[in-house]
C-alpha cells in the first residue's frame, strides 16, 4: 500500500521540488523507494498474489498502477545546499501538509565565522571578510545562548518568502544580474527554543561553529548564523545545514533517494 506520508533524507545539490520530481519518476517506473509498495499493488492487479512470479500480466499491471501517479508535496523547503529530513505527502497525505509545516524543527548547522555572503550560505559571493583573532569556544557558546527566545531578524534575500506575490530569491537573482544587491528584506519573528554548541574549531583565518538548533516554524538558520556573527562582532555565513527533526519525526527513520 502506498504510504500517505514519506520521510526522505534529502541529499545535497537538489532542490526540494527536485526531490518530488525524483519520487514521481520512481513511482512512474515502479522502482526505488516505491518498489515494495508497487509490488503488492501489481500482484493484486495481475492476480499473481503471493507467487513472486513476474509474468507479462504482472509487468502490464505494474505499468497500469504506475501510470496513476498520485499528487505529492512537501512540508517545508530545504535549500539546495542543505540536507536532511523532508516530510513528503502523497495522495490524501498532501492534505496534512498545511499542519505539518507548522511543526517545530531541529537542525545541525555549521556556521563559518569571518565572512558574509550575498545568499547567507556558500552559494553566494563574499561581500564582507574579517580575520578571526582570539575567538574562543566559550565566547561563541555565550553568544549562542543570547539567541534563545524570540528574535526579530531579517530573512535572507534569497529566501522563498513572497513580497507582493514574488519570491524573494527571484528578486535577488534579477538584481544580481544587474550587478545590484537586494538590501530591503522582510523582518520576521523567529523562535529559538534550544541551542547547543557541538564543536568549535579554527580553519585558517576563519572559525567554524557546529551548532544544534531547536526552533519554531518559520525560523531561518541563515538568519541565525548571520546574527551570531553580529553578536560576536564578525561577519558570518551558513556553511552546511542538516535538518534532523520535524516535530516527532526523526531523520533516523527517513529513506534515501537511492537513485539520485
Residue ranges: model-predicted function:
Residues 1-260:
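Catalytic/RNA-binding core of pseudouridine synthases
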Amino acid at each position: 500500500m502506498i504510504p500517505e506520508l514519506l520521510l526522505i533524507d534529502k541529499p545535497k545539490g537538489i532542490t526540494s521540488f527536485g526531490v518530488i520530481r525524483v519520487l514521481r519518476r520512481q513511482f512512474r517506473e515502479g522502482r526505488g523507494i516505491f518498489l515494495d509498495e508497487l509490488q503488492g499493488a501489481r500482484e493484486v492487479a495481475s492476480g499473481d498474489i503471493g507467487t513472486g512470479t513476474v509474468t507479462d500480466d504482472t509487468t502490464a499491471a505494474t505499468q497500469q498502477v504506475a501510470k496513476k501517479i498520485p499528487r505529492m508535496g512537501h512540508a517545508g523547503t530545504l535549500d539546495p545546499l542543505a540536507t536532511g529530513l523532508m516530510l513528503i505527502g502523497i495522495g490524501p497525505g498532501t492534505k496534512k501538509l498545511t499542519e505539518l509545516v507548522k511543526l517545530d524543527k531541529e537542525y545541525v548547522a555549521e556556521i563559518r565565522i569571518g565572512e558574509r555572503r550575498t545568499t547567507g550560505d556558500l552559494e553566494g559571493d563574499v561581500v564582507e571578510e574579517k580575520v578571526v583573532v582570539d575567538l574562543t569556544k566559550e565566547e561563541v557558546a555565550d553568544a549562542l545562548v543570547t539567541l534563545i527566545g524570540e528574535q526579530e531578524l531579517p530573512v535572507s534575500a534569497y529566501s522563498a518568502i513572497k513580497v507582493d506575490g514574488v519570491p524573494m530569491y527571484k528578486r535577488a537573482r534579477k538584481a544580481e544580474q544587474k550587478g545590484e544587491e537586494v538590501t530591503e528584506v522582510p523582518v520576521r519573528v523567529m523562535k529559538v527554543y534550544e541551542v547547543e554548541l557541538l564543536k568549535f574549531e579554527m580553519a585558517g583565518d576563519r572559525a567554524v561553529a557546529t551548532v544544534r538548533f531547536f526552533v519554531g516554524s518559520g525560523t531561518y538558520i541563515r538568519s541565525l548564523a548571520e546574527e551570531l556573527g553580529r553578536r560576536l562582532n564578525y561577519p558570518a555565513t551558513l556553511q552546511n545545514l542538516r535538518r534532523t527533526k520535524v516535530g516527532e519525526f526523526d531523520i533516523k527513520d527517513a529513506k534515501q533517494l537511492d537513485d539520485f
